[in-house]
Amino acid sequence: MNKNEHFKSGFVAVVGRPNVGKSTLINALIGDKIAIVSDKAQTTRNRIICVYTDESKQIVFMDTPGVHKPKHKLGEFMVDAAIESLKETEAVLFVVAGNEKRGPGDNFIIEQLKRVKVPVFLVVNKIDTLKKEELLEAIVSYQDAYPFAGVIPISAKDKENLSEILKVLEETLPEGPQYFPEDMITDQPERLIISDIVREKILLATRDEIPHAIAVDVDEMKTRDDGTTYIRATIYCERDSHKGIIIGTKGALLTQLGAEARADIQKRLATKVYLDLWVKVKKDWRNKSGMLSELGYRK
């Protein structure tokens, strides 16, 4: 595809506090659902590579877990993954929620950014909720703390001003090779994408005490003789009470979660899917390094 002798390419880290819209932004830029989205903080756990390619450029976005003060080994893993990504980029997008005051979490990230030697752009998200003077106040607050290479106000939800991000990055990135085929949009293994789809449905359906105490592992995936893709997945939680909530009265919630996840998986695989979900209790799994490794969490 790359016939442009001035083709631009490079890696761009997308960082920010939990729940500021990083994954929504990535999905909107790529035009596909790669990173799962919910209104719960710390939805993204792994660093996810998402690739945008057109005739003049290839931008490799690294969607990172939200930076927060870790409370367990999983939290430490998530923060390490986010900070590590800053060392491997040609540019950084620091995403903030324009409708929230700059806080300790933002200040922690800014301290990390001070060690970065590449251009850092402030992306002010959720401008659809702001008046002009509120937006200006938010921008000034962050500019007082760090010398950003530029400021890009956007609404990831409404896909407003996203083209400006692509334009600015094309101007910033160096001339370089096309690292990935033009039809590749992520480095995520198929099984991990499927497990994230199931986890997303749980995040959206359950109350606050459950989301970060659950993980999903795809145990088996095979094509049956009739062409149906059979997927067996286990949902791990830390308490018996969580297991009861996920299953629901007479299995109602688990059935609902399965139906919603199956619909999304079928769209991605473009085939009929039989999704077989199981729920198991693994006490304190978030503090067990071996379990985290088995579940695919990697730096």
What label would you give each PLM region?
Residues 1-91, 235:
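Conserved G1/Walker A P-loop phosphate-binding module
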Residues 63, 125, 155:
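Active-site glycine-centered loops adjacent to acidic/histidine catalytic or metal-binding residues
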